[in-house]
Amino acid sequence: MSTAPRRALLVIDVQNEYFTGDMPIEYPSVDISLPNIVTAMAAARAAGVPVIVVQHDAPEASPIFAKGSDSWQLHPQVAAFPADHRINKVMGSAFAGTDLRAWLESHGIDTLTVIGYMTHNCDAATIYHAAHDGLQVEFLQDATGTLPYANAGGTASAEEIHRVFSTVFHSNFAAVVSTQDWLAAVREGKPLEMDNIYLSNQRARQAQAN
């Protein structure tokens, strides 16, 4: 019999920049992700799962997330939530330069559920950090989101970035599920399983061969 996970819900950078600033989240739409973020937070509170809210700080001269600016502020629906712990960070990973790891250890947490923004940046950095530290990780793919990029390395739509990172996460770093599937797992006290790199690759090879 599997042991019930000791979860914490990590809400990453749900800040106004992604809603009304110059870097709007495009996929999934915030009309999808924000309600799921709020739903997950409320469900966590009801189930006794600690909720940790993370906010990114940038220098006052920064064009995005300048500390004290409107774009830096948490979205009102997240700001008003009575979180169990709050973290301000200056790097991608919510672990880097913060007390997150110590807080999780002091509360006996073995499973970290990641929601918020952006899939490929702060979510990814945090997921990799958590997985390498030995935590079980969950990623709610409809309570997160991203935006498009174009640079010397190439171009990618928001949908492409979100889909590819979700696929990679599930292959080796985090169980990728919907908010509804996560709610069911929380109610039932069950762990969520990720795939592995071998099977993920073999399925793709078989699909290509067909």
Residues covered by each model-derived region:
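Short hydrophobic interaction/assembly module
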Residues: 47-64
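N-terminal nucleotide-binding beta1-loop-alpha1 segment
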Residues: 9-14
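A short alpha/beta connector and helix-capping loop motif
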Residues: 5, 23-52
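Short, basic/glycine-rich phosphate-binding loops at helix/coil junctions
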Residues: 18-19, 52-57, 77-86
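Short acidic/His/Gly/Ser-rich catalytic and metal-binding motifs that mark active-site loops
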Residues: 17-20, 147-149
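Active-site-adjacent betaalpha module
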Residues: 2-8, 35-42, 64-210
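Short glycine-enriched, charge-decorated loop/helix-capping segments at active-site entrances
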Residues: 23-30, 62-65, 154-155
